[in-house]
Amino acid sequence: MLLTLLKGKLHRARVTHADLHYEGSCGIDGDLLDLAGIRENESIDIYNVSNGKRFRTYAIRAEAGSGIISLNGAAAYMADLGDIVIICAYAQMDEQEADTHKPKLVYCNEDNTVKDTANIIPVQVS
């Protein structure tokens, strides 16, 4: 049996660009892509914390160090500039791989620089 687990996440990134007429995709600062282990053309889910919208597109590389998070094509309708988003990539693996899997988590500052990285999500407490 294959399980689908979180592979990489950009947490609380901010949308910096939207281009309705660009080919569909999400342009992501190359440094952030690499840190989160997200590959170019990989399917990603985007969760808009600011408005609750959730959608899927694919990642493309934006200039490293630019802080760019650009929603392109139809995805440009899903967020406003400055919206806070969570960008996730998932991977399928068997149960044995899942037992040792650690996701790559990247926590972003307001300017999309790296605030912190981790490979475990803290236990939620009441």
Swiss-Prot record:
Q: What is this protein called?
A: Aspartate 1-decarboxylase
Q: How is the cofactor bound?
A: Binds 1 pyruvoyl group covalently per subunit.
Q: What HAMAP family does this protein's entry cite?
A: PanD
Principal location: cytoplasm
Which protein family is named in the record?
Belongs to the PanD family.
Q: Does the keyword Cytoplasm apply?
A: yes
Q: Which GO terms describe its molecular function?
A: aspartate 1-decarboxylase activity
State the UniProt keywords alphabetically: Autocatalytic cleavage, Cytoplasm, Decarboxylase, Lyase, Pantothenate biosynthesis, Pyruvate, Schiff base, Zymogen
SUPFAM superfamilies in UniProt: ADC-like
InterPro entries, from UniProt?
Asp_de-COase-like_dom_sf (IPR009010), Asp_decarbox (IPR003190)
> What does it catalyze?
L-aspartate + H(+) = beta-alanine + CO2
Q: What is its EC number?
A: 4.1.1.11
Active site per the UniProt annotation: 25 (schiff-base intermediate with substrate), 58 (proton donor)
Q: Where does substrate bind?
A: 57, 73-75
Q: In which pathway does it act?
A: Cofactor biosynthesis; (R)-pantothenate biosynthesis; beta-alanine from L-aspartate: step 1/1
Q: Tell me, which GO biological process terms does this entry list?
A: alanine biosynthetic process; pantothenate biosynthetic process
Native source species: Psychrobacter sp. (strain PRwf-1)
The record, for PANTHER family, names: ASPARTATE 1-DECARBOXYLASE
Which residues, renumbered to this chain, carry the PTM Pyruvic acid (Ser)?
25
According to the UniProt record, one GO cellular component term is: cytosol
Q: What class of enzyme is it?
A: lyase
Where does this polypeptide localize? Cytoplasm
Cofactor(s) needed for function: pyruvate
Q: How is it modified after translation?
A: Is synthesized initially as an inactive proenzyme, which is activated by self-cleavage at a specific serine bond to produce a beta-subunit with a hydroxyl group at its C-terminus and an alpha-subunit with a pyruvoyl group at its N-terminus.
User: How is the subunit organization of this protein annotated in UniProt?
Assistant: Heterooctamer of four alpha and four beta subunits.
General function of this protein:
Catalyzes the pyruvoyl-dependent decarboxylation of aspartate to produce beta-alanine.
